[in-house]
């Protein structure tokens, strides 16, 4: 029973959770489709807030300790948010790429490895 490490994100130390939050924000900030949607106002006047809500939804998804994390579910979360918030179908493969980056980053953070995040910062 692992009850000793229940911070903001199951399995992640407070430092790892903070670094993952930083890294996930960087991944989403570099996602061209999302940034185009925000810059062009595809979500209306609240496009920036909708992008922020997506970032929060991603962190919440990773915080769910009740079920295993499957990349298909993360892809669906990203895809549905783009459709519902920005009326945008993403068919360039970037949803899958972003989901994969986030899953790898989360796995790395579980192991205390922040190399991917450091690369995004630099």
For each feature predicted by the language model, list its residue ranges.
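Extended alpha-helical interaction segments
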Residues: 1-63
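Short acidic, glycine/proline-enriched loop segments that cap or flank alpha-helices
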Residues: 42-47, 61-74, 85-94
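Alpha-helical bundle protein-protein interaction modules that mediate dimerization/oligomerization
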Residues: 73-122
